[in-house]
Amino acid sequence: MNKTRYRLDVAYDGANFCGWAPQPGLRTVGGLILDALRLICSEPPDIVIAARTDAGVHALQQVCHVDLISSPDPVWLLHRLRSLLKSETDLHILSAVKAPVNFHARFSAIGRRYVYRVIDKRSSWYPQNRYFVYRVNAFLQDYRMRRAASGLIGLKDFGAFCKPRRMGSTVRHLRQFEVIRQPDGQIHFFLESDAFCHSMVRNLVGSLIEVGRGALTLQDLFCYTKIAKRTPKIPTLPPHALTLIGIDYPQEHLFECQNRKTRQKRT
């Protein structure tokens, strides 16, 4: 049977979700969307996501695609999904559009952008930040963290910052790693890469926190990076302060080429 592919852009507050992936008995982002789609369509669809997020991680723009036999009008589909999910106030379907068959939410993507929010002892702590900001009980040195971040940018083996895995490469192209202290004292870590390994963002920011507090030297950090093996010296920060900002894609005529390139790298 012929199917029509749809691209769904989604935003969510991850505080009360057990991640994205549908799991029996657990409240997940993908599970709620899948349940809504099952009420709309006769066939049980599969959802392909651009960037899988762990429990507690938020998203301003997550992207997924789904293939449907029923081929509903995308405007109707958007309104129907929003109606079915209206009681889920921490989840919102931003858009629903028909996509070409060679669009792939994961493999067509050329970039993922994240921000991790931290506050240190320089600034006052407000309880309402507890779901979105990581609190560090130390004075962090911004200039040291910026030097560390600039030294990590580029095409490298990020095995030191990735959850150990038997299969697949840990080579990634980190294009952006900025450390910006906001007027209210929060420190925002902005990262962009072609892709990120599991826990890679939280480990990268964790390494900078250790550098900023003086617990890790720049020399040691770059040595661990070169060795490309996980070390307890680089902590994994909690997920609640991490937000997926968005997913970037090439122009439509480049989808097929990008799909092939990504599959060769990641599978």
From Swiss-Prot:
InterPro entries: PsdUridine_synth_cat_dom_sf, PsdUridine_synth_TruA, PsdUridine_synth_TruA_a/b_dom, PsdUridine_synth_TruA_C, TruA/RsuA/RluB/E/F_N. Its EC number is 5.4.99.12. It is an enzyme of class 5 (isomerase). The active site is at D54 (nucleophile). GO terms for molecular function: RNA binding; tRNA pseudouridine(38-40) synthase activity. CDD domains: PseudoU_synth_EcTruA. It catalyses: uridine(38/39/40) in tRNA = pseudouridine(38/39/40) in tRNA. GO terms for biological process: tRNA pseudouridine synthesis. Keywords: Isomerase, tRNA processing. Substrate binds at Y114. It comes from the Bacteria. Homodimer. Belongs to the tRNA pseudouridine synthase TruA family. Formation of pseudouridine at positions 38, 39 and 40 in the anticodon stem and loop of transfer RNAs. This is tRNA pseudouridine synthase A. It comes from Tropheryma whipplei (strain TW08/27).
